[in-house]
């Protein structure tokens, strides 16, 4: 579990935070049990974008996957600007050890890519470079979470497990990492860039998954201001189990 400052919760009713202290303690115990750090057996890895958040996000290289460890708490404020009813409060998550996020080291283009419409309405579809998971732009009812007013000023909110996650592209991270590095990685292994190409050029020719091939025939996704906002499914090979990508953290 990585250190984080209590100022992250300065916008919330601290009395409610104390009410869930028992839950947070339980999560901490689970974290300590699950946290057989990847660093104990695996070498550290460098993936573009993550290095700017090295104090709170660790990346390791396994046989088939990069493993991303974080506590799921971003440096920015949370839950401010939500227009719909939201009772959850963000708490530290045990994304470490066997619960680390898995990103394929060698992404493979799928023979039959899967759209996010009607699929992957549970769990994450990508991981942002600040260690926060990104869910489908559609909530578990199939509605656009942004248009429904469910998201805060940073494009995120909490799930029922008090896990903070985004539903749209966290382009605000470019104020930290710049525009040349990915802002996230889809769980099929392909990188996700901002609304422009890394060289600053206008993005053209996106497919229905919000991605395309570059001049070197490498595939990547882009953020957009309109749906699907982030990767609209998976151009690469993934396994779907009970409506979500497997493995999850």
Predicted regions located by residue number:
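Short helix-loop boundary/capping segments
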Residues: 147, 151-152, 160-200
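Solvent-exposed N-terminal domain segments of exported/luminal and surface proteins
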Residues: 41-130, 135-141
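Long, compositionally biased interface segments
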Residues: 209-249
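Extracellular structured ligand-interaction cores
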Residues: 98-100, 122-124, 151, 161-165, ...
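Short loop/beta submotifs within extracellular cysteine-rich repeat domains
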Residues: 111, 134, 172-177, 192, ...
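N-terminal secretory signal peptides
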Residues: 1-16, 20-31, 39
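Extracellular/lumenal glycan-associated surfaces
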Residues: 130, 160-173, 216-227
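Short, recurring structural edge motifs at helix starts
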Residues: 149-156, 205-211
